């Protein structure tokens, strides 16, 4: 398959070609690998290349899911893939290799995707830019001198560069939304446990951290959420059931909505003029579509919110690190964790 043709399709489009036998899953995998080798030296979006496994999976009997045969990338953070390393963007975890797939990994594979590698992340995903000491900086394909955002920066960079049409991502305080905005993609933080990583996942940040994907089209995001967003027995936060498939939902008119917007910033600093202009254009567009659009303040004391949330988040992070320390078999040594990670770990242990 010619490279320009590969980039012309979203994930569902590629799966349709596979279904029609116009292309094989192996050909799609080779196209993705070719683009990794072409773009990754500049972008550093893909930090583990699982080419041999991907080729073997593509040659085998793939599940008949909506994304059958579509190349896929998994964020190198909290998402086990059997036989693949999981560094969490940290020097401390570099030797960790998972023995089996995680719960959500199995759901992605059941959707028919073919994982070809893992994507860049900041250390333990705790910053909004992807520049860890262990993995190096990830760059934005629209302008390599710019950041790709974080913590799912590698996923967003790879999708925006046309390496894959859809990639796994996760989000606690913007880790899907920030890189999606930086790279011009669709990025949705879903309700907690809408896509549970159970039964073997860890409840990071009291359900505040969720998994989903970044994509180039809304329909890919909807279809992947349909494929992975179903209840799991034992999940701590079962979400309300959906009314209908998301792929159907995006074709329906929402009717007239009441939409509030604000250009207040959580830290009280002035908003950038370009962002303010974009907000005003968006508000005008929504009003022109018939919605009721209201400008109003956030009504939230963010300083108080962060002050109360910080200790709980740090304690939860320390508990998660405890699981990793048990897996590695020792405590981290000086130089194996970045300063912010050390500080968060120490703060969390004081809460235990």
What would you call each of these model-derived segments?
Residues 32, 54, 221, 259, ...:
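Residue-level signal for inorganic ion chemistry
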Residues 1-49, 284, 288-290, 346-351:
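An N-terminal boundary/leader segment
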Residues 116, 292-297:
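General small-molecule cofactor/ligand-binding pocket signal
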Residues 67-88, 251-263, 312-352:
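Short helix-loop capping/hinge segments that flank enzyme active sites or metal/cofactor-binding pockets
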Residues 100-230:
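Short glycine/serine-rich loop segments
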């Amino acid at each position: 398959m010619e490279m320009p043709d590969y980039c012309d399709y979203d994930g569902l489009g590629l799966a349709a070609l596979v279904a029609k036998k116009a292309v094989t899953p192996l050909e799609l995998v080779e196209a993705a690998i070719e683009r990794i080798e072409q773009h990754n030296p500049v972008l550093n979006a893909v930090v583990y290349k699982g080419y041999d496994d991907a080729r073997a999976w593509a040659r085998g009997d793939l599940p008949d899911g909506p994304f059958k045969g579509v190349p896929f990338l998994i964020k190198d953070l909290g998402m086990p893939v059997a036989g693949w390393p999981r560094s969490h963007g940290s020097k401390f975890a570099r030797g960790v290799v998972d023995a089996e797939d995680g719960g959500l990994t199995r759901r992605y594979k059941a959707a028919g995707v073919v994982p070809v590698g893992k994507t860049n992340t900041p250390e333990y995903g705790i910053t909004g830019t992807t520049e860890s000491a262990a993995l190096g900086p990830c760059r934005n394909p629209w302008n390599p001198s710019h950041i790709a955002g974080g913590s799912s920066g590698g996923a967003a960079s790879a999708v925006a560069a046309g390496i894959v049409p859809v990639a796994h991502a996760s989000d606690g305080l913007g880790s899907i939304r920030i890189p999606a905005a930086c790279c011009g993609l669709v990025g949705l933080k879903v309700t907690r446990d809408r896509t549970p990583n159970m039964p073997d996942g860890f409840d990071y940040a009291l359900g505040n951290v969720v998994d989903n994907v970044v994509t180039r089209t809304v329909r890919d995001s909807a279809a992947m959420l349909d494929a992975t967003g179903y209840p799991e027995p034992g999940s701590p936060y079962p979400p309300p059931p959906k009314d209908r498939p998301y792929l159907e939902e995006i074709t329906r008119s929402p009717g007239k909505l009441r939409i509030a917007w604000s250009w207040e910033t959580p830290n009280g600093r002035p908003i950038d003029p370009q962002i303010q202009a974009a907000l005003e254009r968006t508000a005008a567009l929504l009003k022109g579509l018939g919605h009721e659009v209201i400008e109003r303040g956030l009504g939230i004391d963010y300083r108080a919110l962060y002050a109360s949330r910080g200790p709980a988040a740090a304690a939860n992070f320390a508990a998660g690190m405890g699981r990793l320390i048990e897996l590695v078999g020792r405590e981290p040594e000086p130089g194996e964790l970045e300063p912010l990670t050390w500080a968060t770990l120490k703060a969390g242990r004081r809460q235990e």
